[in-house]
Design a protein with these regions (language model features):
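Short amphipathic alpha-helices and their capping/turn segments at secondary-structure boundaries
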Residues: 18-27, 167-177
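Nucleotidyltransferase catalytic core that binds NTPs
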Residues: 1-144
Length: 177
């Protein structure tokens, strides 16, 4: 039975960095892509340009990808426990910074599963975030903003705010559901 390699990604704007890590993953076994859902992304970053289904179609068409599964949480733990890969591969950019806690979780889970974490050098001078900034600088239409707002509302809970200026409106705000 072939070994399995888990790779989590957003997969919105495909670039050489994604292809590099997928190709490296195939050296270790069959590649399972944990494709972050809009819900998982919405609490940490801006929504992707493409919907989850569109991103899934793109990633599935990449030659070395064996399977694409939804990753509903920013944390990898639930998918690692569900799919029990032999390896997880990730760029080394998570060794420091805001995603370090995720790295620490992954190491603990993979140790428990008897698997291995493989970190490869992050591809320099290109990132989906940088490409997105360039695209955003070109501007968007009102229809694109409306479509993005609808997807965002569907992906994460709405925050409701009721302004209070006196005791009565304060009581109303406290008891409003």
């Amino acid at each position: 039975m072939a070994k399995t390699v888990y790779l989590g990604m957003i997969g919105d704007i495909m670039h050489p960095g994604y292809i590099n890590i997928i190709n490296k993953a195939t050296e270790y076994g069959d590649v399972i892509i944990g494709l972050f859902t809009d819900k998982a992304i919405a609490n940490h970053r801006r929504l992707p340009y493409l919907t989850w289904e569109q991103r899934k179609n793109v990633v599935e068409s990449i030659r070395n990808v064996s399977r694409v599964v939804p990753q509903d949480d920013w944390s990898y733990v639930s998918n690692l426990l569900k799919y029990k890969p032999d390896y997880i591969i990730h760029g080394d950019d998570w060794q420091v910074g805001p995603d370090k806690y995720i790295r620490d979780e992954v190491f603990k889970v993979m140790e428990k599963l008897g698997g291995e974490v493989i970190e490869i050098p992050y591809t320099q001078n290109i990132s989906a975030s940088g490409i997105k900034q360039e695209i955003d600088a070109l501007g968007v239409t009102p229809q694109m903003r409306l479509s993005s707002l609808r997807r965002l509302i569907a992906a994460k809970p709405i925050v409701r705010i009721l302004e209070s200026h006196n005791g009565l409106t304060g009581l109303i705000a406290e008891h409003t559901k």
